[in-house]
């Protein structure tokens, strides 16, 4: 009779089953990595934190090949022994199991000891690596602070020089504006001189050397004024460029000051500092926009740009100083030439006036002489009328002689000759009287012309000597012409 299954006691009676127990898999040594790896921080839960940390896999349950086939037909054993012999093992199985447990324990202890040693070495290596990296970071931060301090000093030095140059340029611009305004006074004087000289009369309204110099002076003053104003405009544009460069330097200096404060704070951080904390994922964020080369080049370019602006400013200041020197010399030379032309013209007009006055005096003397001559001629003519009347009366009386007494005797001839002579004398005197009267009229006209010319010359002298030269007694001094007040 056969029964399905066997009891625990009867299992000893059945044939021995070969149950091969597989050994534990070999455990691999951990791999030590020198690079930074993400790690789990205490107090945080992750998705795989619930899984057990096992160093080996549990061996799958091995089944005997005979058991798989015997399930269809259980062995034939006694019913009374099946329950007692079902869970029994052989001594060999027991020894093998104990040896297996001992070997497993020894393997676990060996692995634990090896892992402990490796962990201690790992701790030492990582501690040393962390300390070295922290020291290296501190050195790098210190070097960075030195670099920032160097560029800050360079930027501050350049900024101070640029500010000084801006002040100097502002002073030159103010001098140019003052000098341009100072030119208005001599320009107005020159224009007033031209306007006054337009009031000359007659022939004295001549385009003389004085007028040429005045026109040249007006043109020169306007040209100088225009040059100074144009240079002031160029300086104003350069000052705007300088202010732009100044703002760039100030912004760069401010950024470097902020970066220096931040890096000093980072440099002074220690493991025991109170303000340190975890900031997860910051190492994955790259918000930088420059590298050390471009960072240094940026400040260097700003300094070079500022130096170029200062060079342009220095060139403009030198140009302004040269312009001051040249224009002031030209204005003074032209002012002197115009005054010399005025003096020469005044001397010339004075000489002509003196000559005219001399001629007028002589003319007046001649008029007086002519008037006296006319008076004498008139008296002489009147004096000759008596003898002529006597002679003519005698001839008329002798014409009344009778007959033969009408003789052409010597008295008759003398009387006739006397009448002709006196008559000829009267005609001559009358002719001379008319000539003298014409001469007197000419002298009077000459006197009028001379007096008119003297009035013209007096008006010219009044304009040139009193009005024009009265205004031209003063001229802006050289310091005022170069913008110094």
Curated annotation (Swiss-Prot):
Coiled-coil intervals, chain numbering: 114-185, 225-247, 307-385, 421-444
Compartments, record wording: Cytoplasm, Cytoskeleton, Flagellum axoneme
Function of the protein: Sperm-specific microtubule inner protein (MIP) part of the dynein-decorated doublet microtubules (DMTs) in flagellar axoneme. Forms an extensive interaction network in different conformations that reinforces the helix bundle composed by other tektin proteins (TEKT1 to TEKT4) and MIPs to anchor the tektin bundle onto the tubulin wall of A-tubule of the sperm flagellum.
Record GO cellular component, one term: sperm flagellum
Keyword Ribosomal protein: no
Domain of life: Eukaryota
PANTHER family the UniProt entry points to: TEKTIN, TEKTIN-5
Species this chain originates from: Homo sapiens
Changes after translation: Ubiquitinated, leading to its degradation. Deubiquitinated by USP16, promoting its stability.
Oligomeric and partner information: Microtubule inner protein component of sperm flagellar doublet microtubules. Interacts with TEKT3.
One biological process term in Gene Ontology: flagellated sperm motility
Gene: TEKT5
UniProt keyword terms in alphabetical order: Cell projection, Cilium, Coiled coil, Cytoplasm, Cytoskeleton, Flagellum, Ubl conjugation
Residue spans crossing the bilayer: none
Protein name: Tektin-5
Pfam family, one: Tektin
Similarity comment: Belongs to the tektin family.
Cytoplasm recorded as keyword: yes
């Amino acid at each position: 009779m056969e029964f399905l299954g066997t009891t625990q006691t009867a299992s000893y009676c059945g044939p021995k089953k070969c149950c091969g127990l597989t050994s534990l898999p070999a455990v691999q040594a951990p791999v030590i990595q020198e690079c930074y790896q993400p790690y789990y921080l205490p107090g945080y839960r992750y998705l795989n934190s619930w899984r057990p940390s096992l160093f080996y896999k549990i061996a799958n349950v091995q089944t005997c090949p005979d058991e798989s086939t015997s399930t269809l037909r259980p062995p034939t054993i006694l019913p009374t022994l099946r329950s007692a012999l079902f869970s029994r093992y052989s001594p060999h199985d027991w020894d093998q199991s104990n040896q297996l447990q001992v070997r497993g324990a020894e393997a676990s202890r060996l692995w634990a000891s090896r892992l402990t040693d490796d962990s201690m070495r790992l701790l030492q290596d990582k501690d040393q690596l962390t300390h070295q990296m922290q020291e290296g970071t501190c050195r790098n931060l210190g070097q960075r602070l030195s670099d920032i301090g160097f560029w800050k000093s360079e930027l501050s030095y350049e900024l101070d020089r640029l500010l000084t140059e801006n002040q100097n340029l502002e002073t030159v611009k103010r001098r140019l504006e003052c000098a341009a305004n100072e030119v208005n006074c001599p320009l107005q004087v020159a224009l007033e001189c031209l306007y006054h000289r337009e009031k000359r009369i007659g022939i004295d309204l001549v385009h003389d050397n004085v007028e040429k110099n005045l026109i040249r002076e007006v043109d020169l003053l306007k040209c100088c004024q225009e040059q100074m104003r144009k240079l002031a405009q160029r300086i104003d544009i350069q000052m705007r460029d300088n202010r732009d460069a100044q703002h760039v330097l100030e912004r760069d200096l401010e950024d470097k000051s902020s970066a220096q404060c931040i890096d000093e704070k980072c440099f002074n951080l220690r493991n025991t500092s109170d303000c340190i904390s975890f900031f997860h994922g910051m190492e994955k964020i790259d918000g930088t926009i420059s590298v050390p080369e471009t960072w240094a080049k940026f400040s260097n370019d700003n300094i070079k740009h500022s130096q170029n602006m200062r060079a342009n400013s220095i060139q403009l200041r030198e140009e302004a100083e040269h312009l001051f020197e040249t224009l002031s010399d030209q204005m003074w030379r032209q002012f002197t030439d115009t005054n010399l032309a005025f003096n020469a013209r005044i001397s010339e007009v004075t000489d002509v006036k003196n000559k005219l006055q001399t001629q007028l005096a002589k003319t007046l003397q001649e008029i007086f002489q002519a008037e006296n001559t006319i008076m004498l001629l008139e008296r002489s003519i009147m004096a000759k009328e008596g003898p002529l009347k006597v002679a003519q009366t005698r001839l008329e009386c002798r014409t009344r002689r009778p007959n033969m007494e009408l003789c052409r005797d010597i008295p008759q001839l003398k009387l006739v000759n006397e009448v002709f002579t006196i008559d000829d004398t009267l005609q001559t005197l009358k002719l001379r009287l008319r000539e003298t009267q014409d001469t007197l009229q000419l002298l009077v006209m000459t006197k009028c012309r001379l007096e008119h010319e003297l009035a013209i010359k007096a008006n010219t002298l009044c304009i040139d000597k009193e009005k024009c030269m009265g205004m031209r007694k003063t001229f802006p001094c050289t310091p005022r012409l170069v913008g110094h007040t």
